[in-house]
């Protein structure tokens, strides 16, 4: 018996475009800023004095999402040796985490779901200096400044009573939305 499988995958991790026009340069793009991706499972066994399993405690932790930034940059050549520039960035994304606890000797387990919707604006400024030291060597120096900025995080949370099915899927029995505050995440300068 033979089996045949085919798979195709296409992904675009980032896109950046730079356009030089004389003394001016313009750039724009979309770049991932951070990424969350994990799936952890653990089963602990509770035993009696005879080392017989009384129950299993199943724990699952999942996290997906991330933050991306779209930016527009501008650079200008002041002199033959000095360039200045800056860019404006808009950060956006969603991070979702889930935590499941289930004991096999109980009918139901619990799952906590958290979602953070992140948004924010920041900018960078920079200057570069470059000159020839001699015919073989060049000297290059740069200075960049990024002021402190913040990501606004709109947060939601719910707690669910769940039943673990024989297929390892989860059936939601009841859901309770929990009020959580929105937060600001500081991006240091």
Where are these regions (language model features)?
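Subset of outer-membrane beta-barrel
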Residues: 1-189
């Amino acid at each position: 018996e033979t089996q045949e499988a085919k798979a195709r995958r296409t992904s675009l991790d980032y896109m950046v475009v730079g356009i030089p026009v004389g003394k001016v340069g313009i750039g724009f793009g979309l770049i991932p800023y951070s990424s969350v991706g994990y799936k952890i499972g653990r089963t602990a066994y509770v035993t009696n004095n005879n080392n017989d399993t009384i129950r299993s405690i199943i724990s699952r932790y999942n996290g997906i999402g991330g933050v991306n930034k779209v930016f527009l940059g501008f650079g200008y050549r002041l002199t033959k040796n000095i360039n200045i520039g800056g860019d404006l960035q808009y950060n956006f994304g969603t991070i979702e985490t889930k935590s499941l606890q289930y004991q096999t000797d109980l009918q139901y387990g619990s799952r906590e779901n958290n979602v953070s919707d992140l948004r924010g604006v920041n900018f960078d400024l920079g200057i570069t200096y470059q000159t020839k030291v001699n015919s073989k060597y060049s000297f290059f120096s740069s200075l960049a400044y990024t002021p402190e900025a913040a990501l606004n995080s709109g947060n939601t949370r719910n707690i669910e009573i769940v039943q673990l099915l024989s297929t390892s899927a989860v059936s939601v029995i009841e859901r309770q939305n929990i009020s959580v505050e929105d937060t600001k995440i500081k991006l240091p300068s």
